[in-house]
């Protein structure tokens, strides 16, 4: 188990839009991560666009800034503090990116990363395209595909140093959706909550079926969210994933790998 990352940052009172960049900077500094100096301003503009677009389409359940500061932006960026996890100029795919988390904040904070945002809904990608253009992010590409289909596509299969996901799927499911995208020597990175412990053994068995090695867990403490149990689990890619994985769309969720007595 790794070192607990992050530390508290004071102040939870409501803030005006003009104060967003300062609050973001304070939060980023509390994480003790390296980030591009323009990151706070760009994340503030990202949040403004998210708030506007969310009025006409369901991108996220809550656009309150104080909630989003911890649960979206700092949560997305906290793993940058894990030594060696995000190498310089790494290629990264965010699978099932939704409103862009965690991939777009990572691309904003680390312009050296080559980032692909993949999602199955075109309307979400339309929003992300608008944000990427507004922020001038030349290190971001968009892909319209389901994870299972993308993981079998030779354009994307085993093409990335990192595959990340912040969804609510169980660890064995995330292993099957992410590891096919990862080069041998790279890692899948899963953002997980309290369920991580109970999913650990099945996740490890699933990872081995997919060419993965021993799972690595790092607890995370987010500024202002000290009561939120959170961790990052890295799945190293040791061998190529056999051709049968990922299985067809929907199957990983219905029949997760790594279950006792299962596949």
Predicted regions and their residues:
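Class I SAM-dependent transferase core
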Residues: 2-89, 93, 123-140, 248-249
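Short loop/edge segments at beta-strand edges and connector loops
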Residues: 37, 144-146, 216-218
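Conserved SAM/SAH cofactor-binding pocket of Class I
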Residues: 74-169, 175-176
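Helix-to-beta-strand junctions that scaffold the AdoMet/dcAdoMet cofactor pocket
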Residues: 110, 182-184
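Short alpha-helix immediately C-terminal to the canonical SAM-binding loop
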Residues: 124-126, 196, 200
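Short "lid" loop at the C-terminus of a central beta-strand within the Rossmann-like core
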Residues: 148, 193-197, 222
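Conserved beta-strand signature within the Rossmann-like core of class I S-adenosyl-L-methionine
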Residues: 185-195
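SAM/dcSAM-binding transferase cores
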Residues: 203-263
